[in-house]
Amino acid sequence: MKKTQQKEIENVTNITGVRQIELWRHDDLQHPRLDEVAEEVPVALVYNGISHVVMMASPKDLEYFALGFSLSEGIIESPRDIFGMDVVPSCNGLEVQIELSSRRFMGLKERRRALAGRTGCGVCGVEQLNDIGKPVQPLPFTQTFDLNKLDDALRHLNDFQPVGQLTGCTHAAAWMLPSGELVGGHEDVGRHVALDKLLGRRSQEGESWQQGAVLVSSRASYEMVQKSAMCGVEILFAVSAATTLAVEVAERCNLTLVGFCKPGRATVYTHPQRLSN
């Protein structure tokens, strides 16, 4: 490999989650070039020494991912149930080693499932079909949002995708205040993982992140709705469409679900009473 190519590779590795590889363009199959590609690695969540789940994810913000996954899957009730966390390399990927309280670990062992995930898959490894759409405590109606504030947020969603800007290969999830300001966001090759990262961070931000809604760059699947509801999110905006099961779960748990969010337009699937225009 040429020295200039090697230097470019060294530079790009400063951006977590991106790697440069050789590839060929359709108009020039004789001469390879370097381009940025998003990294996807197996990430195992290990609770008190026992591996619970393996997900394919971007290798960044994994502490937030582990916290958000633990909350959105009902493994913990609050961040206080986790006593410690370390991200360590393993032979085939990364491990997030999590120390749970004894009470929460006993609960986890009682319902433990073996799950080997595809990219951001939230269903793989569910033992029974009845486990899909598990009951979620109905949400209160404490949040409101003016749809006129949505356009500005949509324009800035890409700001939270530095890997996506280079590779075109990530989803984003961001927290949107009632003013339309995006105060924080995360990206990942898996849309569910991006959401878990955001939910994990939100759980640590306190009151400043309690008022508002989630905005995601992807479609809204039932897992996205269920994870949001499990973490007390009342309004979920998605850039793409929603599935029928997502709508059913949102209706049942009192979540306001909005899809096809583009400048000047939005489709409200459930509970429009939280919204104004």
From Swiss-Prot:
It comes from Escherichia coli O6:K15:H31 (strain 536 / UPEC). GO terms for biological process: Mo-molybdopterin cofactor biosynthetic process. The keyword Cell inner membrane does not apply. The active site is at 121 (cysteine persulfide intermediate). HAMAP family: FdhD. It is found in: Cytoplasm. InterPro entries: Cytidine_deaminase-like, FdhD. Its main location: cytoplasm. GO terms for molecular function: sulfur carrier activity; sulfurtransferase activity. The keyword Cytoplasm applies. Gene3D superfamilies: 3.10.20.10, Cytidine Deaminase, domain 2. This is Sulfur carrier protein FdhD. GO terms for cellular component: cytoplasm. Mo-bis(molybdopterin guanine dinucleotide) binds at residues 260-265. PANTHER family: FORMATE DEHYDROGENASE, SULFUR CARRIER PROTEIN FDHD. Keywords: Cytoplasm, Molybdenum cofactor biosynthesis. Required for formate dehydrogenase (FDH) activity. Acts as a sulfur carrier protein that transfers sulfur from IscS to the molybdenum cofactor prior to its insertion into FDH. Belongs to the FdhD family.
